[in-house]
Amino acid sequence: MELLMCSGQAESGGSSSTESSSLSGGLRFGQKIYFEDGSGSRSKNRVNTVRKSSTTARCQVEGCRMDLSNVKAYYSRHKVCCIHSKSSKVIVSGLHQRFCQQCSRFHQLSEFDLEKRSCRRRLACHNERRRKPQPTTALFTSHYSRIAPSLYGNPNAAMIKSVLGDPTAWSTARSVMQRPGPWQINPVRETHPHMNVLSHGSSSFTTCPEMINNNSTDSSCALSLLSNSYPIHQQQLQTPTNTWRPSSGFDSMISFSDKVTMAQPPPISTHQPPISTHQQYLSQTWEVIAGEKSNSHYMSPVSQISEPADFQISNGTTMGGFELYLHQQVLKQYMEPENTRAYDSSPQHFNWSL
C-alpha cells in the first residue's frame, strides 16, 4: 500500500511538473493548451517582407524600373518617374506612348498635338472653359455702346452724342437762328450820301422782332410820360409796317394818313446844354410806311417811343420846357453805347449794331 501511494504521489508530482512546464510554454483554455510554434512565426515574417517588396512602386516604363518609394506621392501613385513623365515618347506595354499630365496616365501618340504635354481631348475642354464669357463682364459694359457709331461715320460719335447731345439738333437750331426776318430796313439813298441800303438777309437783325415784341409794354410806359395821347399810340401800333425810310431833311416833316413821323426837336434854347453833332444826326426824322403783310410788332425800337401826332414839331413850333426835357432824356437813353448804332463816315461802310 505504501508503495502504491508513493508511486501515486510520484505520478502526481510528475504530472504537476509537466503541467507547469506546459503552462509555461502555452495558453490553456479549458482542457486544451495552445502552444506557439516558432517556425510558423518565422514564415509569417517572410510573407510580410515578400508582400512589402511586391508593393514597392516602380516606374512602369520598360527598361527603367526605378524605385519610387522615396519620391513624391504623385509619381509613386501613377508609377512613373519624373524624367519619363515629361518625355515625348516612351515604351509602355510594348507600345509607343506618352504620359498625359491632365489625365495622369499614358496615351498613344496619335492623341497628342505636336509637343503638347496634354492630350487633345483634355485641351479642348480646358480651352472651352477659358473662352466661356464671364457673367461679371456684362456689368462693366457701358450703355454708350448701344448707340451705333456708324450713324455719324465716327467711331467716337456714340460718346459725343451721349455727352453733347444730338449734333442734328444743333444744326437745326442754328438754321432757325440764321433765318431772315420778315421785316426790312431801307433808308432812302438820296436823303444822305453816306447811307447805304441794308438787306434783310443779315442774321444780326433776326432777333429784333422778338425783342420789340417783349418790350412793347415798356415802350408804352415811356410814351405815357411824353404825351397824353396814349390811345393814338395804340392805333399806331396796330397799323402794319415793314419799311423804314428817313425823311428828306432834318427840319421838314411829311405827314400823311398812313405815315407816322417823329420830327427833330426845335433848336435848343440858351439855358439848356447844346446837343452834339452826333446826337443831332441820330435824332433825324424817321417815317413809318404802312405795309401789307407784316404786323405791328415788327417795328423798330425807335418807332415805339416815337412822338404822337399832337406832339410833332415842325415849321418853328415850340414845345413846353418840361416836355422838351423829357424828349431829350429819351434821346440820350438811346444814344448810349449799347443802344446807339455805330456810324462810319466813309461812304463805303455803314455798320448797324443793335
UniProtKB/Swiss-Prot annotation:
Tell where it localizes.
Nucleus
Primary localization? nucleus
Q: Which residues bind Zn(2+) 2?
A: C100, C103, H107, C119
Q: Which domain of life is it from?
A: Eukaryota
A Pfam family the protein falls into = SBP
Q: Which cofactor does it need?
A: Zn(2+)
What protein name does the entry list? Squamosa promoter-binding-like protein 15
Organism equals Arabidopsis thaliana (Mouse-ear cress)
Q: Which gene encodes it?
A: SPL15
